[in-house]
């Protein structure tokens, strides 16, 4: 039977109106399970009516499968159906079925269909676990019931619960691997990510395949799930379902990822609003991550318990370990089921015991459940018990296993229960464009990085840091500083300062020596300082090093801050750390250590002479004649030698000693010492906009500037040095890039044509949806001779060129530029001079012009 245009329009409109009614009802009551159930029923009614109209009701069975078969149809999900044909199948049925499927699309349903006979269903299910799973959630919608019942009986008889369990658990492991990583943290998939809806489906699929029930209440009745666990899992499931319904309704398409574009809108649908401490989207993501964490925890408890029900009882191979614990089939188990109720101190001892027995693969199923329920024993009395405090500290003092232990404690909610302030930051996302992990994950990543420095198997990664930490007495203070450095995030205010009190109280409560208490608290308060100085100040200026040395005071504090700084930067995002930052930090460390070794004082005259002598030695290695550098050096003052390393001084003298006064710009480039990027030297008669033209050139050619030192010689020549990073996906070799820069940049600097800024360029999706408010500050430097211009803005191609153009327009001289890019966030610092900065009205106009240039 063929429907005319009028009935088609009727069905299309009826379905659209029903969808709208259900969506409106959902927005009013926010009841996701009810929406899913009602939408499934509405589609049932539509399909059944059309099935009958096509004359198929008595000839073939129509069944709902997959999520639709489960009665959980999301707004824009596919409607998965099975059409069960008789065998043999008359030709007219095939024609009707084809027309029926076309009708589904015509009225606005996205159909996922399979058309099979009973034997074909059995054969396909036997060979493909995905099809077997799809048919497991199978509900008759229309047509004769007996063929469908026969299919259900034969599928059940054919099913192997053991093989199904192994297949689905392997599938889950592979899915977790695919969806684990940076992109998943920022835009998690509500269905597929670890702790997502699919993890809940996996539990119920396995349970149903084993005949143990297909819902949470059934698992409670079977003793597989407790009432408390069922309440938690239902709540988390509903949270995830609500998020997914909201995503579909807002996107108007099947969108299962919490993408940047929609996070703020979903947060508004949840009634969340920005606060001074947290964006609404950050609050939303914390709700998601906590729900996912609960699912992850319970999935880890329930799957081992289901395994025990499905498999034939494996003989228990036990080995005595302690009063409370024994090894059970290669896992740590409890000797009594209520051990944590009787002896709460055994909770932390369980983690310490597993840490000391790396041959054990984890906690046995009974132990996992006992730990889960034992969390409630961790209260103020538990936290103040000296025995528990000693056990917690011993975990940090063990020679191995700290990272795994802390991650286990976090996974099962023990760490946040023992340290309530840590519990507050669990699942907290940071939309600052460079942290890609939740705060708790970032903290544990930092501790992991510190531990990795200390493990001999990884000495090759950071040899110097490995030597440093292995010479560090009582390294547990470093791990505690890592644990507390960001613990005050999200409270509002400066988290570094707020965290000092938490760290100090913990250390004193846990019996650390006064010296160590002070060190941990100091590290928490100063954990951003070394990174900021290295990337925003001139670390080759002895006075900068002197000030930093006065802050750190001792080699032990210097080493501790250096180790924590590297671990922290590497723990924010895989893309933030690079060898340029590594070099800056290591150079600052060594320079500061030299000052401390001399009693904290710098002899500027000796420092200058030492640099010149080192530069001379390098020139002689390149067969440059004695005193060849004298002509150039006569044009350079003390400031030049203070701001450049000996290697740079030697390079400049080597390439410029024969051309002190060229008429045209000279450009030389070389591979940087760290082999990450290029050093570019510009030597030219000084003129306005020279720095801006160089920045514009690098912006047009997609080279990103990390550092710039701008200097004018006594005889009026610009001697500028840039450190630039190579464009991503660049196919040419370094020699080609060097030749290109030396020729093209020299030509760009020589022209008298008006300055052409590079195109503004595309910004990242992350920055588009979480923009950074531009900030500009101008202050005198420590000598009151120049000014420090600090800028914070969202990074994009050509940003630095626009800043340089504004500075040129106001006739400001740039003496140095420190460029710090953290993900999509630019934090740039310039040392500048010029009359405009001494007039308050002009300085305000400059700030306004910069803000305009920084806006996206």
From Swiss-Prot:
Keyword Transferase part of the UniProt annotation = yes
User: What GO molecular functions are on record for this protein?
Assistant: [protein-PII] uridylyltransferase activity; phosphoric diester hydrolase activity
Q: Which reaction does it catalyse?
A: [protein-PII]-L-tyrosine + UTP = [protein-PII]-uridylyl-L-tyrosine + diphosphate; [protein-PII]-uridylyl-L-tyrosine + H2O = [protein-PII]-L-tyrosine + UMP + H(+)
Q: Which PROSITE patterns match?
A: ACT, HD
Activation and inhibition: Uridylyltransferase (UTase) activity is inhibited by glutamine, while glutamine activates uridylyl-removing (UR) activity.
* Similarity section: Belongs to the GlnD family.
The UniProt comment on domains reads:
Has four distinct domains: an N-terminal nucleotidyltransferase (NT) domain responsible for UTase activity, a central HD domain that encodes UR activity, and two C-terminal ACT domains that seem to have a role in glutamine sensing.
Protein known as: Bifunctional uridylyltransferase/uridylyl-removing enzyme
